[in-house]
Amino acid sequence: MQYTQQAAAVTAEVNKAVQGKQQTVNTIWMAMLAGGHVLIEDIPGVGKTTLALAFARALDLKESRVQFTPDVLPSDLVGFSVYQKETGKFVYHAGAVMCNLFLGDEINRTSSRTQSALLEVMEEGTVTVDGVTRPVPAPFTVIATQNPIGAAGTQMLPQSQLDRFMVCAVMGYPD
């Protein structure tokens, strides 16, 4: 019973941020409970990002958000190593995916090279930088938003990436 009450409390909290989208909220919540990733597709301005951030706040998760543009690099997502002259060693600087809930906003506006940086982390829960594999924090969920194909500056996601999303939710206009 306790889990049911906790799930209802999360749903109620998310519904405060985005009203009238109970089916979408339930779909996303079930995917997250199952350990899956979520793709939210719809036109700009219907609350895709607000909904994703509401889940992060309701669940008190460490979140990270990247607004995908053509100039976002794979290293922005997975991190990079920097040589420290003083110690003579490379030091890893974590990327945006080192969190519990990663929000990839408008994922279909970035290069396919950057999109592919998400493949390992979505499938295996790890990132590999300079030959060193590191786990991301658990639990880990990607909620990505995308605008409809054909909108200015968008491109189709590759099938290999679409396969890593458990569900594709649609927001629709606010009620």
Name each region found by the language model.
Residues 2-46:
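Pre-Walker A (pre-P-loop) alpha-helix and adjacent loop at the N terminus of AAA/AAA+ ATPase modules
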Residues 27-30, 83-104:
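Conserved alpha-helical scaffold flanking the Walker A/P-loop in AAA+ ATPase domains
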Residues 29-70:
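Walker A/P-loop
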Residues 38, 102, 140:
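Conserved beta-strand position immediately N-terminal to the Walker
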Residues 42, 105-106, 117:
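Walker B catalytic acidic pair
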Residues 43, 77, 145:
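P-loop (Walker A) phosphate-binding loop of NTP-binding proteins
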Residues 53-83, 87-88, 93:
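Conserved P-loop/Walker A NTP-binding site and adjacent catalytic elements of P-loop NTPases
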Residues 84-89, 109-114, 122-175:
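Canonical AAA+ ATPase core
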